[in-house]
Amino acid sequence: MEENEVESSSDAAPRPGQPEEPSESGLGVCTSEAVSADSSDAATVPGLTEADDSGVGQSSDGGNHSVEEVSESISTDPLPHGCLPDSSSVSRGPVAEMPGGPPALVHSSVLPDPSMLVSDCTASSSDLGSAIDKIIESTIGPDLIQSCITVTSGEEGGAETTQYLILQGPDDGAPMASSMSTSTLANSLAAIEALADGPTSTSACLEPPEEPQGDPSSVAQQPPAPVTEELDLQSLEAMMEVVVVQQFKCKMCQYRSSTKATLLRHMRERHFRPALAAAAAATGKRGRVRKWGTSTKTTEEDRPEEEEEDDDIVDAGAIDDLEEDSDYNPAEDEPRGRQLRLQRPTPSTPRPRRRPGRPRKLPRLETSDLHDGVGQPLVSSQSTQSPPELQDLEAPSSSGLRALGKVGRGLVESGVSQSDAENAAPSCQDEADAPPRRRGRPSRRFLGKKYRKYYYKSPKPLLRPYLCRICGSRFLSHEDLRFHVNSHEAGDPQLFRCLQCSYRSRRWSSLKEHMFNHVGSKPYKCDECSYTSVYRKDVIRHAAVHSQDRKKRPDPTPKLSSFPCPVCGRVYPMQKRLTQHMKTHSTEKPHMCDKCGKSFKKRYTFKMHLLTHIQAVANRRFKCEFCEFVCEDKKALLNHQLSHVSDKPFKCSFCPYRTFREDFLLSHVAVKHTGAKPFACEYCHFSTRHKKNLRLHVRCRHANSFEEWGRRHPEEPPSRRRPFFSLQQIEELKQQHSTAPGPPLSSPGPEAPQEPAPFQSPETPPLLCPDALGGTTIIYQQGAEESTAVATQTALDLLLNMSAQRELGATALQVAVVKSEGIEAELTSTGGQPSPEDTTPRVVTLHMAESGSSVAAESQLGPSDLQQIALPSGPFGGASYSVITAPPVEGRTSASGPPYREEPPGEAAQAVVVSDTLKEAGTHYIMAADGTQLHHIELTADGSISFPSPDTLAPGTKWPLLQCGGPPRDGSEVLSPTKTHHMGGSQGSSTPPPAASHTLGLVVPQSPPSAAASSTKKFSCKVCSEAFPSRAEMESHKRAHAGPAAFKCPDCPFSARQWPEVRAHMAQHSSLRPHQCNQCSFASKNKKDLRRHMLTHTNEKPFSCHVCGQRFNRNGHLKFHIQRLHSIDGRKTGTSTARAPAQTIILNSEEETLATLHTAFQSSHGVLGTERLQQALSQEHIIVAQEQTVTNQEEATYIQEITADGQTVQHLVTSDNQVQYIISQDGVQHLLPQEYVVVPDGHHIQVQEGQITHIQYEQGTPFLQESQIQYVPVSPSQQLVTQAQLEAAAHSAVTAVADAAMAQAQGLFGTEEAVPEQIHQLQHQGIEYDVITLSDD
């Protein structure tokens, strides 16, 4: 880039204080347009290049910037480019006079030869025109001209007009022409005379890059003075010439020069003399050049060198006037100290002065009033200064050129520059372009009103024209703006306050929502529903819910928050809690202890119970019963032992996981450990980790083969947690729950069967006998062989320790199926074999209600003949009943006692009924003698026999006082024997139907003499006969007895005559534990607990099972062990009852019996006459009620067994874990029961759902010990016992004992008095029981 520019001395600005005078050449009067044009072009340079050291070409406004500009194309072509002379050369060029127009000033370099110009002042215009024509014909061609060259023309007193020429480069075709600045022309043609001598000044066209802060249109920012006449296009084209300038560029920086010597000097001083630069920096002469520059000191030595350089310049220019150009010194091209400040002639308008203060980085835009009154921005002298840090450190040239030399900046290469204003038409030169805007928000100082006109304004109107100056929010209306501004808390842009209350918020939207609390409604509302919102967009988004095009999702199922119990209505918040609660309605106890026989509903309670059976080995260490594992924690040992007997046989080999299904184990191993897919499809390559997924795959993908595949791979039923309740069972439980407080219903249960029966005959529909406790419902059918399995399985379930029957206690459901064929009747307990088709079956049931009442029913030939007897509740409701004899012809029923065969025809049948509450005061007995009458006898404590009066009966109680021929006790009509078979509708009367005409062995419980006291006080003291409601209180009372009428505290010497005083004193010792263990910190309230505790230290187990040999440290554990594991019926026994003092009634003769009963009947409302009574007591009976004295009742042996040893049959009936009586043949020694029930059809152990269903032994085979029994869980589809074996077992287990007993009792029973020796013989084993001896007369 050519950077050397020589200006004439006439262009220099005058020194301060001197008036502006035009030079003699006529060009001294120049307008500010020249200055503006040069400075504006320099201001548009995007980057600055390094200035030449010669300092030639300084043409800045104020001496800080060079008047240079770079081409827009930024050509990097090394070939020389065409340049145009600047305004100085134009102002000193010849003036060409156009024909018919004002004279035109032409640059001397445009001419091919300077001698062509007319140097004489008298040159005519025709000679000048011919010279111009030669120039155009020789140099200007159509391929080079893009526009017109800058020429100035004007008239006298008029301003000049500037036009431009764009030259095309030789290679890239980029426009590379610099604008020619205008200058003031003289009003006369005297300038031609000044130009006659030819050009003497040189002017090189520079190509500086643009400055980023500049304004590319600053040339046009001041419009030229109005001209009187303008040149046409043809005249202007005559003034054009293409000039090609060769340039030299430095490879180490962006410096360019038109001469080679200048470039070499630049390289020596800039790149090879760093010491010179440091010295120059130390002298401080590199600072900002003063606004009004002074002449620099020149030397004579540099002038010849500069003159040689001028010879090398292609376009040397011309010096207009040698006489007046005395200030020109070529030595100023070499930088020697501070550069000389060239002065320019001042324009007619005053130059803007520099403002005081530091130079600004950004230009300060100002307005100046022009002739047309329009304010146009001007770049002030201060705004055009370059920052000091951008100035060159060594070059004394203008600041603009020095800033161009910064190394390392991404600068464009300089060339022949041309501003955008040169391409514009002359008419639009006066339009001001907006300054380039920086991205982002402008600085705060540009927010004033005077700068708003330069901001970009969209042609579209603002949607929210009102702006908040505090936070910048915009609003639609002025009212919204005012409300918003007033809501600002103390002018804080991030805090808002409510104008009506003390509400504060940091969000404007929150305040808007709050304001609707004062207004009352939200402005936007949905058209289809009641939805409202503060914002309209929310309503629009909500309206999509009502759109028909949108697919509506189904409403999610509301999550249940309450789970009511279907039985009692109690509500639980969780399903798990409801499931646990439902167990309370179930009678099943699935968890049974194998050591003591206790059963539990909850597994947690069961495990806590198992901890009591774990005994320490030594040093409080516990050892596993199955292996050598030893630990110090009971719970850890229990969990270990449960792993040995777990009902989950499939165990993972990688972790402790166990399961009861093999496919679950395979899935577990695949998912958790191996990652394999063990379940593969047989029809394709599909495989999965879960068996259920394989089933789904086959059903979906191979539907045609799914049926065959399903037969080979049956689906196992899902396992669910118990208890299970069918809908019918739930309805029954609801009914029982609602009727539990009231009296029991006497009507039969619903006839709809619960279980599907294989066969149902319409002539003889099944009889449904529901158990009042909901544990068991039995359906009995007749005359169908398909029902054999049902009846047999029912009999076994009731006989062999079913959990539902354990809940019933001693009052287990007893059912007899009576077969009448001639004189035979086969009875079974809890079910039996179906009768032959030619017999007339009769079903008699006896079961206990939940409140303790019993119902005895008999049915014959269908439900229409069903007769039921409701038995009242009371302290005797938990009793067991037994039938000793059988009716002669019709048949009999039985309760919990063993049934016997009917006696041969012609023999007189005798019946003795003994209650399990025989030893209590007020015990009731029922006696049946001749099959026509049923007698109710009450045995009192004093030995008298009386009948209860109707006053003592509870309302609605139906007493089993069956009569035949006698008037009812309530005054109703007498029932004849002919109506006994059709009394199904008379069950609701207070007098029960006469079912005794066909039932002689019907056993019903006795009624309470007093419904109040006996129901609350069941236990009485043997010493003072005082009654107590609980056994524990009675035992405490007995221990406190110090005599018949004295009481003493067992823990201290305190004594008193009244039991309440001693009881109140003993309450003080309730928190004391005086009995302490000498080996540990255990302490107890009584010695008995301490004695039991001592067994844990000695590991002594004094109580052993006589069957399996297992030993226990408590007799109670042994008792439950035998009852649960070695008992055939496994009934749960009730609470022990307190017994009255010993009372024995022996009826040895008929006369004594008649007298006793006659006295009893006279004292009450008797129902039998003397003849009937004598006939009923024609046979002698022995009733023995003997209380056995046991020193320690808790340690007594309580056994419930049935023993069969061939011809000898002994039947032991128990209640409350005590043997109540033994029925045996006369002359046979009363043996203690030591054997199991013998079942002759094989020995089997069947386990169902973790419980032993039944155990069968072959007769004569040794009994298995407990340790030899292996509990193997089986599925319901697998049966260890065949159906035939079940039927045979049911027959043998239920009827074999009865058949054998009846075979031995063929004769009439005689009378034999029980002697004290015999009673003592029954006591030697510490067992309490009654003996009824049956012998021939």
Swiss-Prot record:
ZnF (C2H2-type) residues: 248-271, 466-488, 496-518, 524-546, 563-585, 591-613, 622-644, 650-673, 679-702, 1019-1041, 1047-1069, 1075-1097, 1103-1126
Deleted gene: phenotype: Loss leads to embryonic lethality as early as 7.5 dpc. Brain-specific conditional knockout produces a brain with an essentially absent cortex lacking all cortical neurons.
Tissue: Expressed at low levels in cerebral cortex, hippocampus and cerebellum (at protein level).
Cross-link Glycyl lysine isopeptide (Lys-Gly) (interchain with G-Cter in SUMO2) per UniProt, renumbered positions: 1022
MF (Gene Ontology): histone methyltransferase binding; RNA polymerase II cis-regulatory region sequence-specific DNA binding; transcription cis-regulatory region binding; zinc ion binding
Coiled-coil residues: none
Keyword Phosphoprotein: yes
Biased composition (Basic and acidic residues): 363-372
Subunit text: Interacts with NCOA6; may enhance ligand-dependent transcriptional activation by nuclear hormone receptors. Interacts with CNOT6. Interacts with CNOT9; the interaction is direct. Component of a nuclear receptor-mediated transcription complex composed of at least ZNF335, CCAR2 and EMSY; the complex stimulates the transcription of nuclear receptor target genes such as SOX9 and HOXA1. Within the complex interacts with EMSY and interacts (via C-terminus) with CCAR2. Interacts with members of histone H3'Lys4'(H3K4) methyltransferase complexes ASH2L, CXXC1, KMT2A/MLL1, RBBP5, SETD1A and WDR5.
Family: Belongs to the krueppel C2H2-type zinc-finger protein family.
Descriptive protein name: Zinc finger protein 335
Species whose genome carries this gene: Mus musculus (Mouse)
Name of encoding gene: Znf335
